[in-house]
């Protein structure tokens, strides 16, 4: 392979522009245009985006918004067509996409680059007609199929990959990553906000298999992007952990481009100060210095998506013991994986109430359960970002504060907030589908940081409370989660 890193006349280092192999723009709470401006300034000029967050809320209207708004991004945002809308049968989403919809959209929108991550692993393995139909539609359109198989091992993994699924970003260990490579998959090494797996997986990359690895951020906040960067941070970390810079750059450039059949243009490149800190000196797109300016997005088409039932404090209570024990979601800070704990009813010292309220106006479902290890002792946190159905999710100690938080988010059209003693002490409005803000990254970050500080007043000890909270309703990642239909 030709060398990817060269010296510039002014003594710096020139690298190909970076590619994020898998990201959900909505997790940044930024619109595609604003997200693209931010990552482009950090050298990422291409990102493979799976919009299954907004499509689970708004369906095809949400997809259309993302594609249109992305046209104002200086980065090339390529969108996959979500495969799991809804993500599972165990939740209420705002929309659904059928096999016929999938085939029609691939035909109508040739710019769609892949079938988004196939989270319905049981459906693949059992030969579910809907799942296999979507895979067949992607194959007929000549599109790669992105995967999602946490803790994938053995014969189930081999069968999952053999169905035509060519990538996975859910590996937690080097051994898991190696098994996925052996099954024929490309492994995307994830370093995001809620899930940070790069250090654990990097030892799997060898002289014989490095072409089968890429970097991705998956779900990353605007504040993390501003603080340390996205893909440039992956390169920086990999080199600090001992990877050769040339190889680290390959995982961020030519490898994801090859996987998705994208060109690597000599006219798109990044100049960095050195091969340690990878400080960005300049970014060049189409042979010209990057222009990251642009108009503010129009978000009216995807506003007003929070439709809650009438609520009282009495709606928020957890079920009692079953067979003498409480079922409890054991939260692990910095991980998307939870534990299924069985607690004695007298052992409630560290428990907090988790509640999900259906917010799409479909059925008004409300479900609650106990969580452990969050540290929360008073007040409530609430969010309309709850993967992947994005119903309203609240964590609290006081049902009255939970009700206040839910009502406040409904008044904002979605977002995140902290309530203490009946008062909203911090919020982040997300009026675009209850997921995104029309504001610039710096404004979103300031609000998000204020939320984190406010969350500390509840006793919450999680490093990124709202990022962790948003995954407590995602049943496709084990072991115990809560949706509007109950514990899964």
Pin down the residues of each PLM region.
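Active-site microenvironment of metallo-dependent hydrolases
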Residues: 7-8, 40-42, 226-242, 246-488
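Active-site mouth loops of central-metabolism enzymes
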Residues: 19-32, 86-100, 163-166, 170
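Divalent metal-coordination and catalytic microenvironments
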Residues: 22, 43, 66, 115, ...
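Active-site beta-loop-alpha junctions enriched in small/polar residues
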Residues: 24-30, 52-54, 82-87, 118-122, ...
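Divalent-metal coordination cores built from histidine and acidic residues
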Residues: 33-142, 425-429
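Short acidic, glycine/serine/threonine-rich loops at helix termini
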Residues: 58-62, 88-94, 126-130, 156-160, ...
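Histidine/acidic residue-rich metal-binding segments in metalloenzymes
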Residues: 96-116, 123-188, 195-215, 226-240, ...
């Amino acid at each position: 392979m030709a060398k990817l890193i060269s010296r510039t006349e002014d003594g710096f280092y020139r690298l190909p522009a970076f590619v994020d192999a898998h990201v959900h723009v909505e997790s940044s709470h930024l619109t595609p245009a604003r997200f693209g401006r931010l990552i482009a300034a950090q050298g990422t000029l291409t990102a493979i985006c799976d919009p299954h967050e907004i499509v689970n809320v708004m369906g095809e209207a949400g997809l259309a918004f993302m594609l249109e708004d992305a046209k104002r991004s200086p980065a090339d945002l390529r969108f996959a067509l979500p495969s799991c809308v809804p993500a599972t049968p165990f939740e209420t989403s705002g929309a659904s996409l059928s096999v016929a919809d999938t085939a029609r959209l691939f035909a109508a929108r040739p710019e769609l680059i892949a079938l988004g991550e196939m989270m319905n692993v049981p459906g693949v393995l059992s030969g579910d007609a809907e799942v296999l139909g979507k895979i067949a539609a992607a194959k007929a359109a000549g599109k790669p199929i992105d995967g999602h198989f946490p803790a994938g091992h053995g014969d189930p993994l081999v069968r999952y990959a053999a169905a035509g699924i060519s990538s996975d970003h859910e590996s937690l260990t080097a051994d898991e990553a190696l098994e996925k490579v052996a099954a024929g998959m490309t492994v995307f090494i994830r370093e995001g906000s809620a899930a940070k797996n790069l250090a654990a997986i990097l030892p799997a990359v060898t002289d014989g298999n490095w072409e089968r690895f890429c970097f991705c951020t998956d779900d990353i906040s605007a504040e993390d992007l501003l603080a340390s960067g996205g893909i440039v941070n992956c390169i920086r970390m990999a080199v600090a952990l001992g990877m050769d810079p040339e190889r680290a750059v390959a995982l961020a450039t030519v490898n994801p481009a090859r996987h998705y059949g994208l060109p690597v243009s000599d006219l798109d490149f990044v100049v960095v100060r050195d091969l340690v800190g990878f400080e960005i000196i300049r970014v060049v797109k189409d042979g010209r210095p990057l222009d990251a300016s642009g108009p503010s997005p129009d978000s009216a088409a995807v506003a007003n998506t929070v439709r809650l039932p009438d609520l009282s404090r009495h709606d928020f209570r957890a079920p009692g013991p079953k067979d003498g024990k409480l079922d409890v979601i054991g939260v692990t800070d910095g991980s998307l994986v939870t534990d299924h704990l069985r607690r004695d009813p007298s052992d409630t010292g560290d428990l907090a109430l988790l509640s999900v309220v259906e917010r799409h106006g479909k059925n008004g479902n409300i479900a609650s359960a106990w969580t452990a290890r969050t540290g929360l002792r008073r007040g409530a946190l609430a969010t309309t970002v709850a993967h992947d159905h994005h119903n309203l999710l609240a964590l609290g100690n006081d049902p009255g504060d939970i009700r206040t938080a839910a009502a406040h988010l409904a008044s904002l059209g979605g977002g995140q907030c902290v309530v203490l003693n009946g008062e909203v002490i911090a919020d982040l409005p997300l009026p675009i589908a209850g997921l995104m803000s029309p504001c610039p990254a710096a404004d979103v970050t300031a609000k998000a940081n204020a939320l984190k500080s406010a969350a500390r007043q509840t006793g919450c000890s999680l490093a990124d409370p709202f990022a962790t909270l948003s995954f407590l309703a995602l049943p496709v990642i084990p072991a115990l989660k809560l949706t509007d239909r109950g514990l899964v």
